[in-house]
Each structure stands twice: as C-alpha cells, then as structure tokens.
Amino acid sequence: MGEKEDLFEASASVVGYIYQLRKALYACIERHGRGLDWCIAIEAGDDIEEITDRGRVLSQLKHRATGVSLTDSSTDLWKTLRIWAHAITHERVDLDGTDLLLLTTADLPAGSVGFLLQPVASGVRNEDRALEALVAAREASVSRENRKAYEAFDKLSEAERRSMVARIQVIGHAPDIDAMEALLLEKVVPAVGHQYAESFLERLEGWFYRRTIRQLRTDEMDAITGEEFDQVFTDLRDQFRPGNLPIDDDIALLEPDPSDHVDMVFVRQLGLINAGGAQLRIAVRDYIRAFTQRSRWSDENLLLPGEISRYERRLVEEWQDIFAEMEDNLGAEATEAEKVAAAKEVYRWATREARRCIRPDCDEPFVAKGSFHILADDLRLGWHIDFLARLMAVLEPAEATSA
C-alpha cells in the first residue's frame, strides 16, 4: 500500500511540475510581441516569478483532481501563505511592487478565503472578510500539517497581514494540464497555422524545458528574458515558413558509432575510394542525421507530397553531370589509382561543393550530405567509376546466401 501511495505522490509531483512549466511558457507567449522588458524564472522567488516594467508577480500553482476544493484550512492555501509570509518576514519581497498570485485547478467555495480574494473583476473580492476568515481558520485549526504555516502567519504584524492580503489574488478552477496544452496550441496557431501548431509547440516546449533545467542548475539568477524568448520564438517560427523546414537540435547533435554501420552499402562505397577513418565517421554521422531528420519531417507531415522524391531526383541529376564528366576524363585505360583519385574528387564535390537545399532556407549541411549517402546506400549513385559492378558482385552473392 505504501509503495502505491509513494507512486501516486511522485506522479502528482511530476504532473504539477509539468503544469508549472506550461503555465510559465504560456505567460512567455502571452508577453511575446508586447515588448522585451520582462523576464521569467521557475522556482526562484516562487513557483513562477515574473518581472516586468510594472513590477513583480510571484505565482503559486496548485494542480488538483476534479472535485477538490480550496477551503480555509486547505494545506494548499496555508503552504502558499507560509512561503509568502516567510518572504515578508525576511524582507525578501517588497509588497508595494509585488503581486501575489495563487492559481489552482481546485474550486473556490462561496465565502471562502480563496473566493473572497479573487480579482476585482470577479465582483466578490472582500479583503477584510478574507483576512477575518484566515485568522478564524488559524485559531480554530489544530492541523499538524499546517503548523509551520501558522507559525509563519503569526510572525506577521497586523499591518503586514493586511498588506499581504491586499496583494493576493486567487484564481480557482483554472485550466488543468491537458487544457493548458490546448491553450498553448491556440496561442501558437497565429504564428505557424493550425497545420504546424503541434510540431512547433513540441519544439518550443522542448527548448523551454531544457532552458528551465539550465536555470534550476545555476546558483545565480538565470531568468528567461523577453529578448531571449523573442529570438527563440522568432527563429523557430521562421523554420516553419514555406521555404524552410525545422532542424532539430537533438538530431543535429547525433554522434553515432561508425562501427555499428560498417556493413551498410554507403560505407562500402567509401571503402572503394579508400576513405579514411575521419571521413567514415563524418559520413555515418551525416547519414544518420539526415535519415532521422527526414523521417521526423515525414512522421509529422511537414513535407509536401513527393517532396523527398523530387529532392533526390535533383541530387541524382546533379551527380550524373559530375560522374559523366569523370567517366569521359578517365577513359578506358585508366589505372585503379587514377580511378580512386577521380572518385575522391566526385566525393569531395558531393560533400564540400554541392549544397542543394531541400528548401531555399533549409541550408543545414547534413541534410544534403546525408541525403547523398542515403542515395549511395540504395546504389542510385556512387563515387568510384565501377561502384555498381563491384558492389553488386559482393552484395548479390551475400543476398543469395542469406535467402
């Protein structure tokens, strides 16, 4: 039973943390395009801390199951108050320039502290009644779980309590983690359209999570600034323009082990031209990156119908020009050394000079270089003048044996 409870608590913590990140990302997207003078941090001054030219907002987030209510004795309420009271007592927060926000997916019972501290626009806000209810709840409760929160509350003077309550806003029945994903998708649709919204958001969230981890592992304040977010958002959006395709960092950094691919045809092709170890490593790297990136584009429907086929046709036809020139220059009496030297020039052209982009603005080198290796693996092109005959002589007997 204990293990199940621990697993439930761990799962709830993970959900709560992802919820926190999604709310922070939503806040960034909301501010995007409305100026750069802001920054946001996770688990710095609070769950989420926002600093703008209008002041500071400290937010506590509580993700709870459907049907849960935020009562006056709720642990969620008092844990939040404990954090804020502690910050006030230790002079880590200036209430004159700070808003305190408690956002919860729980319901706010009528007349409760949370209900009475909703934003002014709700029409029910009453700070005096809310403070009275807090004091009454504190005096009536014997909760051990809330003991430290009560002690922190007791340390506040009457004036400090009133000042704190005046800065608190409670938002109940907030969108849960799934609803937040839907809201995020709505936010990015204007940037990339409905067709690419999910792919765009997946990449933006990935960057945001990695960036947040970096911030959490840094001792000093390393908040995400408006300028930084604007650059990332804009750069990523541009990758979804009609003339571009997204290049994913996790793929662009792949470094596969060449020894895992020694039997592949494109590697055998390099063996025919006596390619060195460094060239083999780079070739395998480019092949894997291009293959993986192209597969992801296809899986996410980011490609136009027949786009890969048309791209490969262009590469093959360009190669045909270079290869035909090599054949003419070598002639029938060429030695093996001359053939290898000429093949190296063809390979050099493919990897150093041919930069045919799949789309005008998608100029990542591994896409073209790796696509050449994909074609070489299918024997649709090669480097050595006799590549087809030599490889077929090796591959066909092997295929017959395996059959």
What positions do the PLM features span?
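Hydrophobic, glycine-enriched assembly/anchoring segments
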Residues: 355-403
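Acidic metal-coordinating catalytic centers involved in nucleic-acid phosphodiester chemistry
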Residues: 1-11, 63-358
